Amino acid sequence: MAIILDADVLIRGEKGTFNLQQWVAARPTEQFEVAAVTVAEFWHGVERATGARRAKRKQYLQTILASLPVIPYTEQTAYEHARVWAELESAGEMIGYYDIIVAATALERGSKVATFNLRHFAQVKGLAVIEPR
């Protein structure tokens, strides 16, 4: 079962508050991936940054893209996205739209999500969630 890294895991890795490289290296049998929507979130951060910060963020993102497969948003992802969205909305338990897409991507592939935002992702039925340590 692959592990899809949520944006918060990548952000903490970028900021140096979490040693992402060490955590991944300690799990050599695991396949790590990133959802396309997470790449969009990062590009947004790069585009908003200026000067040296922009260059640093861009380099970090390019390193991530060179080392992790990016999982596309497919028609099946769209179905899972709509299903999870409707389920959460009907229950009055909405989470962030990007989080729903990450969850849908994981559900479509039978993957886990690695996140520090356990509270949100735990609301998605059938989703395997792990907190990196």
List the model feature ranges, each with a label.
Residues 5-6, 35, 95-96, 117, ...:
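Histidine- and aromatic-rich ligand-binding microenvironments
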Residues 1-2, 103-133:
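Acidic, PIN/NYN-like endoribonuclease modules and their adjacent C-terminal/linker elements
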Residues 8, 59, 79, 100-101, ...:
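Active-site phosphate/pyrophosphate-handling residues
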Residues 28, 66, 124-125:
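Short, structured coil segments at secondary-structure junctions
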